[in-house]
């Protein structure tokens, strides 16, 4: 009998040691999150379940979804799969009410005893899946923030002037560290470096995160210029100078806290970014400076319809002067004030440059269902006739100030002038940058430098010449490499009537499931979607699916020929007349547009715009055996 009692007592002790004590953690702090759409408002631990109360906030009338593949992991490596949802149906669209806020629960098995924190993770194959790391269960406090060995943040002297800004070309190194990084977090980050000629040009620059949270990215830049690191849907801003290194430590816990529903007003978890590199004051005061730069008033759509171009200009100048006054009276460092004042002048010019498009957009919106293309064109022509040739000439001097290179508005002015073929009146920095951008546009379209362009380049600054020569060498190497690539095929449409063209194209692949992609070489979303679908195409390579790409003459032939080697599939380039017919007939209202055709030649799905890899894969698999 004694042995039986001891056995029962031991069994009870074992059960107690394996299950958590019943308790509730209200508004638990967490390490980081990749979303602001959901947040844990309460954790309830019992011997039978673990329940997360979820507070959701999202656009009213839009939906979110909780995946049935979601799970919890704890600090000991144990996994707890999701069991049920209360107030939300797993894998079903949860439509947000008018308030944009909602609450529901998700249920998991009981945690093992002694768990300090949990992560909520939706499976890796869930596109845009929610992740919340380090939900604290013990004392509701985060562990001490630890920095990489040897890192030292640049100290900011509030009285120091902005360092001299000199145009240069060369290698810049970005060294980063994701603080609190651990296994299970995303192992890649995106580094974007701004080009003062055309904005972001390296949007696909992914870098690997090492197990210790560090990463390094090296690039050739024309600058100085600005850059961003995007990780777990959080963005850190910095600056780069050719020949120098920028070091940054990304504090995910503070970035997540600032946008938290329940902890935004709590004591900060340090700085969002710790930085050692060029223009340290600008980085340290980035948020405060941007608030002053971006807080200006703007005209409503109704006001835009009644304002003259001259009145628009007066309004924008008044607002800019108000913003400059606020900058001068702020507590910003002298360096950041100098930058902010220049950035505001650049922003003013960019705003004046965009005035016609803003007014036209307001006019189109005002017409609603009565929109008429001829009417809009007449309105546009009348508007443009009212714009003086010297509309903003007295404000242009700031574009020759090298500090303008640090402003994101500068590239829009340079690229717009290059596209319009505008030739600035003087031969200052702006004229030099526009001249460089004009030549660079050809390289972007896979057109190597001509002898005439090489001669023209001699009048440009040495840095611009170095940049163009380097880009030309890269292009020549790419063209040679493309000659050896396989996996794509150029097809001729042949002599066929417009009304038979689509049927003729898809009939070449009868008996197969066909994904038809209407796209263009100049379309950024098209190019991004093509890249995102590469893993999907590899995964479905054993399925009987053909990928058909149709573009028109707006895609320059040379650009198209050198872009398609990296887009595996069947390619067609049609005439402007054929393109117009196809767009009208099949409702191609913009690019990209996707049409899925079954094995019998019937259209089963269409999407204007990229619907995402998951949706595309779902529609294709519906039709495959």
Where in the sequence are the language-model features?
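Short, well-ordered beta-strand segments enriched in hydrophobic/aromatic residues
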Residues: 49-58
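Short, solvent-exposed, Trp/other aromatic-anchored flexible loops in extracytoplasmic proteins
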Residues: 81-126
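A non-transmembrane, solvent-exposed segment enriched in polar/low-complexity residues
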Residues: 86, 129, 134-335
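Oxidative protein folding and maturation machinery
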Residues: 164, 169, 252-512
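Conserved helix-turn-beta segment immediately C-terminal to the redox Cys motif
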Residues: 512-513, 530-551, 618, 622-624
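Conserved redox-active cysteine motifs that mediate thiol-disulfide chemistry
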Residues: 518-535
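Conserved segment of the thioredoxin-like fold in thiol-based oxidoreductases
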Residues: 528, 538-579, 584, 588-591
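Thiol/disulfide oxidoreductase modules built on the thioredoxin-like
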Residues: 577-621
């Amino acid at each position: 009998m004694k042995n039986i009692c001891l056995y029962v007592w031991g069994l009870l002790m074992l059960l107690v040691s394996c299950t958590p004590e019943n308790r509730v953690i209200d508004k638990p702090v967490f390490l980081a999150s990749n979303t602001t759409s959901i947040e844990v408002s309460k954790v309830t631990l019992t011997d039978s379940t673990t329940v997360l109360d979820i507070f959701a906030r999202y656009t009213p009338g839009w939906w979110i979804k909780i995946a049935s593949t979601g799970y919890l992991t704890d600090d000991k490596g144990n996994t707890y799969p999701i069991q049920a949802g209360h107030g939300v149906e797993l894998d079903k669209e949860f439509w947000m009410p008018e308030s944009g806020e909602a609450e529901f629960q998700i249920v998991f098995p009981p945690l093992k005893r002694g768990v300090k924190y949990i992560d909520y993770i939706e499976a890796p194959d869930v596109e845009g899946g929610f992740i919340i790391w380090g939900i604290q269960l013990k004392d509701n406090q985060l562990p001490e923030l630890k920095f990489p060995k040897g890192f030292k943040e640049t100290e900011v002297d509030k009285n120091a002037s902005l360092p001299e800004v000199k145009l240069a070309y060369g290698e810049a190194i970005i060294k980063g560290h994701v603080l609190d990084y651990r296994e299970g977090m995303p192992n890649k980050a995106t580094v974007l470096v701004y080009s003062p000629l055309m904005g972001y040009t390296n949007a696909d620059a992914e870098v690997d995160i090492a197990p210790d949270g560090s990463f390094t990215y090296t690039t050739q830049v024309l600058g100085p210029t600005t850059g961003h690191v995007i990780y777990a849907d959080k963005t850190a801003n910095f600056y780069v100078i050719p020949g120098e290194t920028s070091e940054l430590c990304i504090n995910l816990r503070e970035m997540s806290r600032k946008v938290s529903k329940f902890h935004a007003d709590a004591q900060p978890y340090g700085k969002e970014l710790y930085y050692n590199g060029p223009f340290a004051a600008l980085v340290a005061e980035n948020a405060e400076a941007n608030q002053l730069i971006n807080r200006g008033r703007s005209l409503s759509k109704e006001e835009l319809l009644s304002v003259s171009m001259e009145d628009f200009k007066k309004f924008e100048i008044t607002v800019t002067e108000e913003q400059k006054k606020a900058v001068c009276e702020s507590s910003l460092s002298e360096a950041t004030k100098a930058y902010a004042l220049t950035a505001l002048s650049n922003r003013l010019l960019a705003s004046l440059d965009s005035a016609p498009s803003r007014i036209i957009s307001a006019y189109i919106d005002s017409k609603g269902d009565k929109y008429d293309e001829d009417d809009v064109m007449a309105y546009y022509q009348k508007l443009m006739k009212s714009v003086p040739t010297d509309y903003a000439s007295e404000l242009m001097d700031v574009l020759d100030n090298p500090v303008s290179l640090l402003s994101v508005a500068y590239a829009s002015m340079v690229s717009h002038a290059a596209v319009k073929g505008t030739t600035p009146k003087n031969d200052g920095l702006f004229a030099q940058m526009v001249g460089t951008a004009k030549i660079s546009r050809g390289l972007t379209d896979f057109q190597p430098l001509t002898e005439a362009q090489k001669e023209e380049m001699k009048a440009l600054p040495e840095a611009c010449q170095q940049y163009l020569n380097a880009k030309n060498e890269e292009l020549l190497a790419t063209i040679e490499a493309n000659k050896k690539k396989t996996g794509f095929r150029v097809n001729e449409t042949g002599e066929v009537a417009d009304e038979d063209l689509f049927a003729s194209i898809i009939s070449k692949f009868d008996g197969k499931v066909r994904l038809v992609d209407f796209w263009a070489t100049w379309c950024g979303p098209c190019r991004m979607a093509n890249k995102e679908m590469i893993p999907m195409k590899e995964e479905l390579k054993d399925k009987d699916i053909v990928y058909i790409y149709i573009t028109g003459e707006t895609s320059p032939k040379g650009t198209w020929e050198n872009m398609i080697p990296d887009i595996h599939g069947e390619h067609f380039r049609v005439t402007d007349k054929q393109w117009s017919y196809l767009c009208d007939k099949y409702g191609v209202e913009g690019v990209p547009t996707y049409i899925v055709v079954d094995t019998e030649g019937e259209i089963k799905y269409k999407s204007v715009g990229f619907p995402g890899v998951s949706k595309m894969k779902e529609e294709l698999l519906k039709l495959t055996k």
